């Protein structure tokens, strides 16, 4: 990618769903990481969103949700391979909420899940953070999602900032 001109055109409003033919997230994400790593000697920060996962949850569309998750899984796989090769790249995977109250029903089998949605809005389900690479250990345990900011600053070796996370008094 270095030294070359390129353009990546996407939807003007919402990106289309995988079921509508959108298959560029894995390749576009890897292209962005490769481009930024070639251009930026001091490192880079890249945010990639699988936004249609949320919309499939709102629609309670299990087929679309599974397809979107598979697409995002391929995106993550590409970026983990990129990070493994470089050795200096931290990959974080998380979300800001769960949508739909998704549950796996009794009687599900490998390759044949029975899924149920409990609502069509956001839930208060705890959201995991998966980390791979240098300083990944900073992201273990249970913490407020707003603490991600401070953990990322620490991982990058930046000066600590005062946390404004609400902590109820005991």
Spans of features found by a protein language model:
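Feature captures the catalytic ectodomains and active-site-proximal regions of enzymes
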Residues: 1-170
């Amino acid at each position: 990618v270095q030294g070359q001109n390129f353009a990546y055109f996407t939807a003007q409003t919402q990106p289309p769903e995988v079921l509508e033919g959108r298959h560029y997230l894995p390749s576009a994400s890897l292209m962005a990481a490769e481009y930024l790593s070639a251009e930026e000697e001091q490192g880079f920060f890249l945010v990639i969103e699988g936004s249609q996962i949320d919309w499939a949850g709102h629609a309670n569309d299990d087929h679309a949700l599974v397809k979107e998750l598979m697409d995002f899984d391929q995106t993550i796989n590409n970026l983990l391979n990129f990070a493994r090769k470089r050795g200096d790249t931290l990959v974080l995977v998380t979300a800001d909420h769960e949508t739909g109250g998704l549950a796996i029903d009794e009687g599900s089998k490998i390759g044949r899940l029975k899924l149920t949605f409990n609502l069509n809005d956001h839930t208060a389900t705890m959201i995991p953070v998966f980390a791979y690479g240098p300083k990944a250990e900073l992201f273990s345990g249970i913490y407020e999602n707003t603490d991600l900011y401070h953990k990322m600053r620490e991982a990058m070796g930046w000066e600590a900032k005062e946390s404004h996370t609400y902590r109820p008094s005991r």
